[in-house]
């Protein structure tokens, strides 16, 4: 049975600082819950919402209702949300495409104190594997809802015919984020698994090389795949992010 992933706002009565988490393309808040709970236990308030079109139970919604401009606004709205709740000091981390969006948001919003990108495609080259992963995610969602084979086939055809337009938007965002790297002034965290099947292996390092005037913390995770927040590397990732926050964010 499919259950729609919900936004989370993990509170801590002793917290004075907030962390915004952003999930990846075709992902949801589920991918960020382990990290969110960990950071809550360390004394932070943590907020994560689903990007528009995500987490609805209908993958076509990502294409119909989503888009880069909407998702950038979702990230800004998340910062406003925690500030409206009284937390003025904010850090931001994103996974995969969420990492690109977090980076772009930090380039534009200098009052975000620090943040980073986890498994982010700073080198974005689309392959058939990307499309198959997207269709695979969609079919997993449809099967969980017991959709008919005829309906799934029809929906798959729609996704294949329309995803490339959004891929072009993502490619443009990646290019602009790389070009805007000089605007980034905050301490920055980068993470990538050495067995990441979705990324070019030089992805994180390529962006690190653009940040000559920024304090950068860069970690690799041996034999770890793409979704570092939930795979076998998640404990190491959590502790590395905590150390980064202790150095750059903790009062």
Language-model segment annotations:
Residues 94-98, 102:
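Gly/Ala-rich beta-loop-alpha elbow adjacent to hydrolase catalytic centers
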Residues 186, 200-209:
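Short alpha-helix in the alpha/beta-hydrolase fold that links the catalytic acid
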Residues 223-251:
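Catalytic active-site module of serine/aspartate enzymes centered on a nucleophile-bearing elbow/loop
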Residues 184, 190-192, 196:
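Short beta-strand/loop motif that positions the catalytic acidic residue
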Residues 116-126:
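Active-site nucleophile loop of the alpha/beta-hydrolase fold
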Residues 40-60:
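Conserved alpha/beta-hydrolase
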Residues 163-180:
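Active-site nucleophile elbow and catalytic-triad environment of alpha/beta-hydrolase enzymes
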Residues 57-87:
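Catalytic nucleophile-loop/oxyanion-hole region of alpha/beta-hydrolase
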